[in-house]
Amino acid sequence: MPNNNDNFSVVLANNQISVRNIYAVVRNYPAHAKEMGSTVNNEPIFFQKSLTSLHTGAKIIIPPDRNIHHELEVVVLVGTPGEFIDQNTAIDHVAGLALGLDLTDRDLQNTLKKQSLPWFLSKSFKGSAVVSEFRMKTDGIWEKEYWLKRNETIVQTGKIDQMVFPITKLIEYLSAKTPLLEGDLIFSGTPQGVGPIKQGDNLELGVAQEIFMEIEVE
């Protein structure tokens, strides 16, 4: 199997962590909101990806007849469960951070949007929640620019301090709507530069000079 992750887990400090829920936030970078013809929101807006969309392997298989887009994101791993978490203590609930791709069936998403329907089906196909190994939240590398390369060309870059709603605010807001569990993942939004991928592409995700993940698209 290309995923090799049928137990739906991620890795932090050589430990396997079982994933419970996968949440994602929309339009958390102003430039991305603009490129999508939209604006940022007054409050975070979340959607969910299916647990079966989780992918940690070095190869992904995409439907050849679909317009699949990459969306590079910093992914949060919840380590300590809680609800109604205060922003000032929210970081204490974070076990680690990773890079990920919120792969999106763009044509299907646009069709669902026009019908005012949820995006779930366009965001939850098998392999659409790509996640690297997690790093400790205290790792100073997270202050640096993160990036996505497609066939050795940088197509997306971002920094955590460019977010409209910082990670701690996302945790505060989401935990007030639904309890967060140990092993929950939060995709924290994508910077500008989203675009299509196709079979034969090679993708690299990294921060500063360090490569976090290499992926072959099949």
Locate predicted features.
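Catalytic-core "active-site belt" of small-molecule-metabolizing enzymes
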Residues: M1-L181, L185, G193-E218
